[in-house]
Structures are given as structure tokens and as C-alpha cells.
């Protein structure tokens, strides 16, 4: 199958990339293994900011802080969409802190399948998803062994 079949009609424009990041981010929140999706989002946002297609706005207090500690996230604007990602040390030095997250603003809905979004971002970032290899095979079921009363199990 052609690798470009999914993204033939999708060019890596700011609008398409922001919709793809939105779609990947939305699916990552409920995915059984979200690490790859969040990594793809992070790399795409970093590249968009580096190329000047996105802008770091400031810092927000995180809605879900780790270990119950107060934590901040960087607010990034790309097209009509806003995203959060973990900050770097430089972000704390150079970006203003915006306080708590404004709940009144919502990103516009994007109609893009996860497959198309992933392929567009993978092409843009230059990343490939490694197939998920199960860590361990489940052992075959063994019937329990019952010993006679008084016999040792060892």
C-alpha cells in the first residue's frame, strides 16, 4: 500500500496541521497507549513553533498536575487552535504566566480521521510508529492441582 494514500489530498498547511494535532490530541486522551500520540503532538508543535507557524503565548497552571504539585503548561497558538505542552526551562524565563486556564474558550471542531491526522503529522515530523510488541505472552491456563488432605503442596 502506498504510504501517501492517506495524505494525498492533505497538504501540510497550518490549517491542516493544526486540525491534525487537534485530532491526535483528542484521541490520545482516551487511547489505551497514548505515549506515541502525545510524542507526535509534541514534536509537531515544536516544529511548527520553530518554523514560525505557531506561537508560544504564555504559561497556564495545569488542569491535571502530576503528583498533586502545582504545575504549568505552555499555551501554543497555531491557526485557530490552542494547545498545551510541557514547558522548558527557557519558557519559564521568557514567557508571561497567564494564571489559571480560561474554560470559556474551546477549540473549533475538526473533522479529520485519526489515521489521516497521524499520517500527516508523521510525514511532517519525519516519525514512524513502531509496531506495538506485547511485553509478555500470557501463560497458558493450567488447571489447579488439588492434593489429598494432609499432603504437601511443595
Swiss-Prot record:
Database matches in Pfam families: YkyB (PF14177)
Name of the protein: Uncharacterized protein YkyB
Gene name for this UniProt entry: ykyB
